[in-house]
């Protein structure tokens, strides 16, 4: 391989690594909602990164990179769950990620409680509410999930109602 091709490959690799560093927490959050054991969480994270790497040369920047990352991460996680027959339909989020660190912080406890409730939702509902909590617009959620904007709005309303009902039942 000539030096120009090597430079191009190194440039692509550096760009990819920069993207992964920027979106690492987002990828972990998506993976976190779909698995419990830390070893599996790390394996799933690696699968997502591998799928992102495989798809990176084909990324044409026709959409925001965050949408592209969410789409691949969600699809990888859902595929993983389908393959793993021994993984339960929902997982418990009682261990702490690096994004939930303060044990005595009331806000952190509320977040833990919210994520435990979210974990009881179906796969699509989990994906939708996760994107909503990441401040994605209905249009962005629609593009990532493949649902219509109207369907996203309806589903979000129902998801919020389910979460409110779960909260009251606790």
Residue ranges of each PLM-predicted region?
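Hydrophobic positions on the alpha-helical face of helix-turn-helix-like DNA-binding modules
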Residues: 48, 72, 128-129, 141-142, ...
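Internal acidic/polar
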Residues: 79, 86-114, 137-138
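DNA-recognition helix of helix-turn-helix
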Residues: 145-169
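Short helix-coil-helix linker/hinge
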Residues: 21, 108, 118-126
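Pre-recognition alpha-helix immediately N-terminal to the DNA-recognition helix
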Residues: 15, 26, 113-116, 126-127
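N-terminal module of bacterial RNA polymerase sigma factors
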Residues: 1-26, 33
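Short amphipathic alpha helix immediately N-terminal
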Residues: 120-140, 144
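Structural recognition of an alpha-helix C-terminal capping motif at a helix-to-coil junction
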Residues: 29, 43-50, 54, 63-75
């Amino acid at each position: 391989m000539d030096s120009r091709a090597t430079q191009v490959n190194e440039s692509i690799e550096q760009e990819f690594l920069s993207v992964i560093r920027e979106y690492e927490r987002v990828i972990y959050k998506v993976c976190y909602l779909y698995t419990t054991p830390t070893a599996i969480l790390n394996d799933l994270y690696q699968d997502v990164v591998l799928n992102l790497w495989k798809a990176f040369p084909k990324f044409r920047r026709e959409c925001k990179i965050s949408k592209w990352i969410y789409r691949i991460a969600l699809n990888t996680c859902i595929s993983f769950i389908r393959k793993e027959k021994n993984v339960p339909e929902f997982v418990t989020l009682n261990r702490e990620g690096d994004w939930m660190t303060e044990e005595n912080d009331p806000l952190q406890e509320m977040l833990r409680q919210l994520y435990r409730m979210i974990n009881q939702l179906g796969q699509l509902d989990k994906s939708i509410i996760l994107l909503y909590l990441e401040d994605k617009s209905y249009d962005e959620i629609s593009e990532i999930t493949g649902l219509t904007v109207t369907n996203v709005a309806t589903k979000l309303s129902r998801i919020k109602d389910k979460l409110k009902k779960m909260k009251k039942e606790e």
